[in-house]
């Protein structure tokens, strides 16, 4: 069984790779190709956030009793902040403003990097420790990817 740390860190890397594809496409790809790449990236980010918020975080909170003010509270807040940036990116995408998309993407990348360090080095290892074998059932609830 893959640990929560490995599984979710791998998903972070998958999201990073999808953003790199969008950045490359923003240079000179046809609008439809750029739009499709952005939609894949945006869907992957939403899938990751939704899984954590609906499945992982509640399980961690139940196992540890940590809720308000705990690590999942902070992670949810950061997800909301990143969702707002993603909304701005979607608006730039819809308006055909490639540079605005990339500029917002730079902001998102900074937020994601800071967020992922916290999850990968603190929260996910804590999930491994507190969820134990229960992680396998949770992992099975992760939506199919791409």
Language model: regions and residue ranges:
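Small-residue-biased structural context
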Residues: 1-146
């Amino acid at each position: 069984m893959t640990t929560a740390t490995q599984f979710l860190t791998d998903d972070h890397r998958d999201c990073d790779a999808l953003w790199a594809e969008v950045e490359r496409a923003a240079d000179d790809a046809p609008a439809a190709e750029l739009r499709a790449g952005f939609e894949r990236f945006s869907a992957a980010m939403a899938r990751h956030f939704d899984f954590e918020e609906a499945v992982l975080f509640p399980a961690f909170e139940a196992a540890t009793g940590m809720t308000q003010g705990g690590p999942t509270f902070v992670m949810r807040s950061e997800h909301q902040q990143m969702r707002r940036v993603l909304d701005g990116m979607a608006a730039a995408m819809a308006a055909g403003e490639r540079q605005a998309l990339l500029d917002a993407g730079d902001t998102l990348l900074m937020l994601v990097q800071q967020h992922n360090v916290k999850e990968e080095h603190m929260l996910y290892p804590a999930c491994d420790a507190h969820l134990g074998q229960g992680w396998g059932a949770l992992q099975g609830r992760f939506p199919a990817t791409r």
